[in-house]
Amino acid sequence: MVFNLATSQALRAVARTSVASRAQIMPSVIATPLSVRFLATPSSSSKPPPPSPSGSPASSKPAKAESTDDAQSQPQPQPPAEPELARKGSSLFDIDTSATPLASQLIEAEEAASRSDAGKGSTRAKAKTGARSMSSIERRRQNTVRILTGFVLIGAGLSAYKLGRPWESSAEAERFADSADAQTFVGRIKLRLNAMYDDYNKPLFEQLLPDPLPFPYSRPFTMVIDIDDLLVHSEWSREHGWRTAKRPGLDHFLGYLSQFYEIVLFTTQPFFTAGPIIEKLDPDRRFITYTLFRESCRTVDGKLVKDLNHLNRDLSKVVVVDTNPDSFHLHPENGILVKPWKGEREDRELIGLIPFFEAIGIYNIDDVRNTIKAYTGTHIPTEHARRTAAIRERELADNKARLERMGKFGSVFGRVSRSASAGLPADKTLYDLERERYLQAYLEEQKYWNENGDAIRKQAKDEQDRQIREMKINTWGFFTGGLKPQQPETPAQ
């Protein structure tokens, strides 16, 4: 009931607003944007403008009578409230509740309650910003994180101590003897970490190939050759899937040069992708002596490199043939770069390289690196053909001149001249004779395999099956040390 009385008093105070004040408010309402929610009005302390003198007295008399009736029906406002209204700005939503003492008491009680609530609210705000209660799962997670962090810090400290300890073996001391960081704690940590990374990037084994075979099974030179876009080219299509084609002249290239070179197929592919292709290239393993895969490479500056230092061969007798210069990045003097093959049928690059590698084998070059350096920046098949033709013409001219000199003494030393000229024809050089000999040996080997290849393969397959049968063993044989021989069955009486 008290609240209803205060509300009615407030509504009457709003209705008491003068007409002149409304006239002053209208321009500001029009000038204010429509998006503004609360409209500012002049301060309650400002006096309303005086009425216009042109106004009629009759219109002012009813206003005076109305204000007199309102003043008689409502009590006079409290004097102390006027300074407060003068300090605070008024708005359309300001309500003068100072008309009755009861309303003032209600307002004071409300303000006291609000102040007490504000104090409690500030305490609650502080409580909210402070530590909040945690569930058991969150508390367990927090404890777990703290424990794991402690273990990590302890492990990091122990690892740093172990890496920075003094050299314990003479091998480590000799390995890092030339380093300036070998005498400091942090320097030893750095050296050991770099050594671990270097050991991880090294090939799988220290020696990738076994020791060379004894004569006559060994070859004087070693050819390290890649497979991707050098010997074969693989492509994929929706109709056929993956298909692999051999480069023209591949069989002759491998078969003929295997007489001079120990052919090592070294690819950057893993075994499970390159193994089936190698089985198709050389099913009888007649030409390819060894195979090395991605596991035998190492990483240098983010590149896959074939490190010849781990090949267990004399580098003066090693030739690397590849389509990627990064493969022989550590040994560029041993590498020959070949144009990649993309499946062209008219390609003759491998056939053109055969005379160059053949000449190295026939002349038994002491250091192949000097020969490769002499052909740097040239197309080797074309340049070698030009140089070989010039050398052959010069040798043929020397042979002809020698035969002419020997012919002058034919009457005296006829038999000797005929025997000397019979061993070396006038139209052939020593290189031509050696080339014919190796070519004849290659043709004879091809003929032998064409005639006896099936029988040799069948014999190898039978031997493989026999070894597999001998390897089979059951559980009883594993515990008893072998299977007992079966006794022959005796016929029933």
From Swiss-Prot:
Membrane protein topology class: Single-pass membrane protein
Keywords on record: Membrane, Mitochondrion, Mitochondrion inner membrane, Protein transport, Transit peptide, Translocation, Transmembrane, Transmembrane helix, Transport
Membrane topology (Mitochondrial intermembrane): 164-493
Main location group: mitochondrion
Residues annotated as transit peptide in the record: 1-39
Subcellular location: Mitochondrion inner membrane
UniProt-annotated stretches for the region Disordered: 40-86, 109-138
Gene Ontology cellular-component terms listed: TIM23 mitochondrial import inner membrane translocase complex
Pfam families linked to this entry: NIF
Organism domain of life: Eukaryota
Record-level GO BP terms: protein import into mitochondrial matrix
Stored Gene3D superfamilies: HAD superfamily/HAD-like (3.40.50.1000)
Task performed by this protein: Essential component of the TIM23 complex, a complex that mediates the translocation of transit peptide-containing proteins across the mitochondrial inner membrane. Required to direct preproteins in transit and direct them to the channel protein TIM23, and possibly facilitates transfer of the translocating proteins from the TOM complex to the TIM23 complex.
Protein name: Mitochondrial import inner membrane translocase subunit TIM50
Lineage of the species this protein comes from: Eukaryota, Fungi, Dikarya, Basidiomycota, Ustilaginomycotina
